[in-house]
Amino acid sequence: MARYTGPTWKISRRLGISLSGTGKELQKRPYPPGQHGPGQRRKLSEYGLQLQEKQKLRHMYGVNERQFRKTFDEAGKMPGKHGENFMILLESRLDNLVYRLGLARTRRQARQLVTHGHILVDGSRVNIPSYRVKPGQTIAVREKSRNLQVIKEAIEVNNFVPDYLTFDPEKLEGTYTRLPERSELPAEINEALIVEFYSR
């Protein structure tokens, strides 16, 4: 399945979450597109709830179905809770951490920065958005890319960096200091439903 590249506001309204991180998609019409009001939302079956939760997480991180399932299966081989490990692996993606550091305003924008070669990991250029960053590794903007307007704008509006990251706004450089705890990952996701979905 290819990655969705259409308007994110439709997906945001359908799933009831903000994919842009701004929440603007849900401010005016916090109900799915095509419906005539908030009271028209259909009650979902158990399978429907599981599928919706899977789609929420998949679209949140901007991952196609094949990558998503591959990461899920990999998480199942790790010690600990399957669902929590799955979310930690997704959170450790390079494009996501570029977004978390505030170098991009959305994950989609962060993915483009990585793909276009603007990002370094431990001093080497990495252009693979799914690259898994390990604790202790450093993420930085290339010297030639430091004046990009999209990065400047993102830095101006970013006022929060998670505790598992450190960031130096002068150097445009951050470090993934440790793996995140569950309490630091998206609270609106019930990963148990995703585990149930793939266990059917």
UniProtKB/Swiss-Prot annotation:
Belongs to the universal ribosomal protein uS4 family. Keywords: Ribonucleoprotein, Ribosomal protein, RNA-binding, rRNA-binding. Pfam families: Ribosomal_S4, S4. HAMAP family: Ribosomal_uS4_B. One of the primary rRNA binding proteins, it binds directly to 16S rRNA where it nucleates assembly of the body of the 30S subunit. With S5 and S12 plays an important role in translational accuracy. GO terms for biological process: ribosomal small subunit biogenesis; translation. One of its GO terms (molecular function) is rRNA binding. GO terms for cellular component: small ribosomal subunit. Residues 92-155 form the S4 RNA-binding domain. Part of the 30S ribosomal subunit. Contacts protein S5. The interaction surface between S4 and S5 is involved in control of translational fidelity. Residues 21-42 are annotated as: Disordered. PROSITE patterns: RIBOSOMAL_S4 (PS00632), S4 (PS50889). The keyword Ribosomal protein applies. This is Small ribosomal subunit protein uS4. CDD domains: S4 (cd00165).
